Amino acid sequence: MTTPSGSERYIVDSSGWVEFLGDGPKAAGFEPFFEDPASLVLPTIVVYEVFKKLLLERGISFAEQFYARACELRDSTIVLDTDLAVRAARVSVETGLPMADAIIYATAQELGAKLVTSDAHFAGLSGVTLL
């Protein structure tokens, strides 16, 4: 299992945020990646996915708690621009990843960040830690 290193950057994908915030069965595996906010990178597509899921399943108050935490990472938030969109489209064609997953993976690749997830779509891809 990969553990965070002070010199590396990490993207915890939507599945990891939901597990961690909801104290799911894999929350403990994701917890170390949230301990150093300076090492976290947060793609805006992750904000969308997590906020929506929490809003639907846990309500507005819980979703807004996540949003407040996401705002604390504003300096590490990566916005989808045209270059990243094209890179993600290429990744999707090459790997078969769905759109949101391709954006997340392309963001990690672009930044040289490790992607930490429990989503089986990412299994076998370079730079991915599957919990």
Predicted ranges, named:
Residues 1-42, 55-68:
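Short, well-structured N-terminal submotif of metal-dependent ribonuclease cores
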Residues 1-7, 105-131:
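Acidic, PIN/NYN-like endoribonuclease modules and their adjacent C-terminal/linker elements
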Residues 12-13, 42-44, 96-98, 119:
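Histidine- and aromatic-rich ligand-binding microenvironments
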Residues 14, 82, 101-102:
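Conserved glycosyltransferase catalytic-site signature
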Residues 17-18, 47, 122-123:
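A generic structural signal for short hydrophobic patches within well-formed alpha-helices
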Residues 51-52, 89:
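Amphipathic alpha-helical segments within well-ordered protein domains
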Residues 71-93:
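Acidic catalytic patch
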